[in-house]
Amino acid sequence: MKKIFISFFVFIFSVSVYGIQYDFEDGVIPTTINDIQKGTLSVSSDHAKMGTKSLRWDWTATGALFRVNDEVNIPYAIKAFSNRGGLRMWIYSPKAMPGKSLQFIFRNKTVRVYTFDFNLNFTGWRACWIAFSDMWVPGESDDVQPTQQDIDELTIKAPEGVESGTLYFDRWDFSSNINKQATPDAQIPKNNRFLTRDFWHWGRLWEWEQFSYSDELKDLVPTTSELAELREMTTTVQTALFGKVNNTTIANASSKLSAAGIKRDVYTGFISGKPLYTDQEKESGDIGCQDVNDMMLGFAMDYYFNGNSSAAENFMLVFDYALDQGYAYGSGMGTNHHFGYFNRDMPKAVWMMKDYLKSESRWDEALQLIQYWSGLAEPRQPYDINRDELLDTWYTLHLPRLYAALMIEDETERFRAVKGLSEWTNGSICYTPGTIGGIKPDGTAFHHGAHYPDYASSAFGILGDYANYVNGTSFTLDASARAILKQAFMAMASYCNVKEWGIGVCGRHPFNPNECSIKSKNINAFAYLAVDGETVDKDLASNFLRIYETATATTAMNNMKKKFTALGIEKADPMQGFFTYNHAAQGVFRGGEWMVSLKGFNRYVWGAEIYYSNNRYGRYQSYSSIQILDSG
């Protein structure tokens, strides 16, 4: 076994995040892995998550186990208990074992100190990430949180009642810092059970998957009119989503496939290629989930528009590769943080390939994948007003959820899914409490604990598209949601000098023009909301026309302009007067074509958003900043 020293300082200060990583590339099993009972361990090239080899475990009887007596790295990780020290590895299962699980036991000599189970209801690779502080104390109830104890041994026990089987282990280390956003999944549903931020939303896919609809299918009888609306909306959305062929997207897919080296062995069926990780784990040369989305969309587009059969084969190759690598139903991939941003193209790709997937008897599997990674299960239940980061959900997940719902073939099930999403949407367009994400009573929109127009603009753009799709149906926005959303849009029209807002509310990108103004693609939201009710809302329509003049117009925008002009609606005059946004600690004074933005901060609203690589010197951007903006 080759031991990779992640940090030169591991032996000096013991502060490296990963310590020593087992990678098995030299074909040798370390002497610390021993006491193999009722089975064998070997180094295999069948499957690998790092390099070309992994540790293969074949057990031949119940009660099989092996131990890891690592008196250097296990104590190293436990010393970082308060920093979320723990275990990280990837496990490959060639065969799903529903209802069965591995048992991990950490000991101090002969005394069991920590334990956890790893469910084996999967095939392919799955991440096993858990901090010692989230493990279980033998003999104690679930609500007892572990304390730091000395440990020096790990025992891995085969699943009870399974007489023989095979598993593979790779990318294994005893870590001094398990990501605080380690994602609960089907393998360890409570691997982050003492998370203090109850509002965290990226890591809730598996939790949502346990939700049930309040409407039983047998009791749900959609009307003929509702089904007709559903069919028409499905066609409308599908036409808009598929758009036109993009040769650059197609070429990009082929280029990425070649670079990824993804291949299927014609004899064993095993799939090989560069390893796939989410951005938080991905290193140079690895494949990311966005790469998978890019490849699937390009090949789907080539097949759908050009009838290219080899593109269909490549699509299936990438699809199977993704599943094999752990980009699958029920998987958390270690941490899936911000998954909505890298998962937006897959629904479109899968929908394009529907007929082909059905011909391969893979449609149900693909649809399940789309429904899971879009979080469609969340709106099975009413909106929870205390869930956070709502703008991210609107922006990255809302339309994929609609697509996933409309892909359902059974019309009653499709109706239930769209109805649930509609009710959840109406519930989410509300005044959210405190500083959590969402719209506030003064029309500001919070993200990351403060008013954040850049995120709001993008989220509102998606809500506008959604409103356009459901307009005129029984799934449309209700009066309350429409009124609150209008208030937020009109507030944006007043704190923007045409499209641009003040530097004090630019967050961590104060000097990037694309992050400090309403993007052209989001302007149509004003128009779509204007026509969402029974009559055209002249306030929204006239402000759309005012902002439209400064935008790079699309066909849809031009059509909305013609519609409003035909109704005699003229562009709005610039806002006048003083506008107070107490939730944002902001004031805006408008006069003619100019605007003054005043920004402060307080104990509830931060003065600047500073990341390690963003806005390092932006501390004072809200310290009573006064900015004069001209005509935009």
Please tell me what each predicted stretch does:
Residues Y466-G632:
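Extended polysaccharide-engagement surfaces of secreted carbohydrate-active enzymes
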Residues Y18-K38:
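Extracellular carbohydrate-recognition regions
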Residues P146-Q149, P159-S175, Q181-P184:
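Extracellular carbohydrate recognition
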Residues V43-F66:
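Short carbohydrate-recognition loop motifs
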Residues I4-F13:
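Sec-dependent N-terminal signal peptides
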Residues W59-D142, V162-L167:
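Extracellular ligand-binding interfaces
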Residues F24, I130, L154, D170-F174:
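Extracellular beta-strand elements of beta-rich domains used
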Residues R231-K519:
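Aromatic-lined, polymer-binding surfaces characteristic
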